[in-house]
Amino acid sequence: MQRRMCVKKNLDMTEGTPISLLWAFTFPTLMGNLLNQVYSITDSIVVGRYLGQTALAAVGSTMPVILLLAALMIGINVGVGIIISRYFGQKNEELMRRAFVNSLYLGLFLSAGMMVMGLTFSGTILRWMGTPEGPLQEATAYLEISFITMICPLMYYLFSSAFRGLGDSQTALYCLIVSVLSNIGLDVLFVAVFRWGVAGSAWATALAQALSAVVAAVLLFRKYPMMRMRRQDLRLHGKLLRQITVLAIPIAVQSAFNNLGNLVAQSAVNLFGEATMAAYTAASRIGTLALMPVETIGSSLSVYASQNHGAGKPQRIRQGVRASLQLSLVVSTVLGVFLLLCGRQMAGLFLAEPSAEILTVVQRFLLITAVPGILAGVMQVYQQVLRGVDRANQALMGGVMQLITKIAVVAVGAWGMRNLDVVWLGWPASFVAGTVIPYFCFQKIAREIETE
């Protein structure tokens, strides 16, 4: 009886119309990610308006580094979500619990290693990236605090991944609302009221994520008694660790590749000076509004594909791909038009007196990278569906091509031609390059699994 009650609360994507199921699952996650992006934009506005252009450039320069070193956590989070969704499709509650526990062990071990690495090499990495002396000290402080508190986002994202693996993106949204609202409140308090500077912004983020992790843990174990750990669940499970690792490593490496591309892009932007760095920080925050929704649709497709793969319904996977492409086209078109019309006005919010140079850089970045968001949507669909059917290595091959293309175009634009527009072309070019291999791999794999 308890099992039926628990399962009924989830979204079972093995039955029903694919486009309706994907939208029902994507919408709460999409709203949550948009809300999270609203926080990111608000954080940059608070830093830019109260601390100035140098502080905004400092915070922006650290983001590729933080995301690069956090790539292993991202891989674990996505991997555990896919595995939990697979065992949910099989109705195997014991393995769902054990997979979650073992992901916690793996994540804790890796986060400790990343914390030590980040504390040791933060200043060196920022100097290697060519960060100007003006924002360097504040950037180093922000980066070091982020790694000291790495355990906070780790725990929060692992619990959120468990909700998503169970098909419950709505509760994950509630936890995100707690994180975003507390983050904005603490950000204003620490930066605008207490005047703790860039360090205050870093501590605000960590404390908000810690609070959200606690809320997520309470909700997970209260709402889903089947996820409450028994003593036997606490043992290390070699087979599950291997499954998580096999999924996590390609995803983590691809995430690292993506962020390595962003790190190279940040290094390229640093060549153009502090004003361009501040403009890029604002532009990348705004541009994510167009790119993040299609990433969310792709992520939802991986859960959909995993559930149907686990349930032995391969014919529904191809239907899910078509539905995801349709959703991506609609969402990316609407948001692309919005940013084209309103991007320059949004950029004016980040600094008290933004220069014409900053506003122009933001506008050109959005026109070239965010407006053609459908290219990113197609790439995400084909990469994510491969992950959902246990073909993460093929998705990784697409990620490698994406990275190589982005770095090559950015390098030509920055170090060869000294032309920012060419640097920005690295984004759409990489989306196209990252699609080719996953597309043809999926066509081949789809035929294979449909005849199994």
What are these regions (language model features)?
Residues 24-43, 145, 156, 179, ...:
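Transmembrane helical elements of multi-pass membrane transporters/channels
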Residues 29, 33, 45, 49, ...:
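Transmembrane alpha-helix boundary and packing residues in multipass membrane permease domains
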Residues 77, 145-164, 172-183, 201-216, ...:
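Short runs within selected transmembrane alpha-helices of multi-pass transporters and secretion channels
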